[in-house]
């Protein structure tokens, strides 16, 4: 069978000599995830998606094939096609412990060094230059920003200083003009990493797209809540200790954007996610000293 062929699950399992199938229940994706083990005890990840996602998943498959040529620890795509009435993508399965749980077992120096490694991996991913989007970042970003503001203002729940958030966002949205675009992981944080033999493994490229490289740092809160040293190392590793003058100003803007979009999103998932959204807001207030700081308090500088 060739890549792109339609197969049944049994045919696929037979083709790869699979002897064991286990379901994996992790992450927010609606994809079904199966861990496959073949007769030689090689492991694979089988992602099963709705057929309506064909264009997105096929593009993801092709981009992953390009990224996998880099010397980084990430899943390698093996096969892609239609599986019964759905889509499948077969990837190598990488061993490791969940980084968000494992990171706190390391010393501050070790956490920082793992962050350095993650930052260097991210820089390598961003070095892909064989393809780009036809639309500019601003052309994609501006319509989304209008929807985010309207959704937030129409939301039943808001932050106490929501007017400040909206005004700051509107006053600084010009920063999004003329931003470069590169290939991004799309959700680069500890929740999508493993640690194996004291090294970072990057997984779950489900949100891979072309975006402003600084947009990649937007989910930093999930790192900082586990390790300020890891996030500091990630930034320093990415920039080789030479932080651009505009980085923290843009990171603050993206932080405000995240606060505006997080709460309405959380409301669709229930009370616990709403509590998390408010907790993140309180932390951001603390890290930015009520938004008086440009550089958040968790950043440790070059160590």
Q: Where do the protein language model's features map onto the residues?
A:
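ATP-binding pocket architecture of kinase catalytic cores
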Residues: 23-136
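Active-site acidic catalytic loop and adjacent metal/ATP-binding pocket
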Residues: 32-37, 167-217
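A general structural signal marking secondary-structure boundaries and capping sites
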Residues: 68-71, 81, 97-98, 122-130, ...
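Short beta-strand segments
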Residues: 45-48, 78, 183-186, 202-204, ...
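Glycine-rich, phosphate-binding/catalytic loops in enzymes
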Residues: 64, 107-108, 201, 218-220
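An alpha-helical support segment within catalytic cores of ATP-dependent transferases
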Residues: 4-15, 116, 127-186, 236, ...
